[in-house]
Amino acid sequence: MFDTTLLSTSTIAVKLVEEKKDILTEERVLLDETSLIKDKWSPVRQKTFIMGRIAAHNAVRTLGLEDIPILRGRDGMPIWGKDAVGSISHKDTIAVAIVGKSDVYQCVGIDIEDMNFLLAKEEYSLFCNEEEIKSIEEGLLSGTMIFSRKEAILKTLCTIDTNVYTLKDIDSINFQKKHPKLYLSCIYYKSYIVNICYISK
């Protein structure tokens, strides 16, 4: 396992874990969390679940917060300790987690995507609005970037808003018109884009 810090301040941390060995034997993963792995999951899904939890624990420890099991709540969302808000995302061989102190952040979200993965117009048209489609066609943003931005925003909003959102509902360009306190930023790592999103208190 290879651990990288993408962002670290006194109130928020973003950690990334890359596959380097069989991490299912990783000692830092708590037994309570490995019991959440479902038998029907593929070996890759099992591994990325553990990698995501390792990234999350690393972020929690970076902030000096209590390192407790990160269990699963409704819809499989992670349950964080009382002093933390967080989000996890992963691809086949890489995982990221963002954790913020709950006295500073109301909610956070994160998404990771491979920049080399290109979406056809018939694919990104399923989740993009007209302005987003125009920005793709003009080469300002890629379909993958817009998808990742929407995922990070969606993960942020779903923890504080009872409305049910779809990717089509999320405006990844003019999001602050509807959510003025929402902050979105992108970190580039190798061939990956990591979009982080948060709402401060």
Model-predicted regions and their roles:
Residues M1-K201:
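Core catalytic alpha/beta fold that binds nucleotide/phospho-ligands
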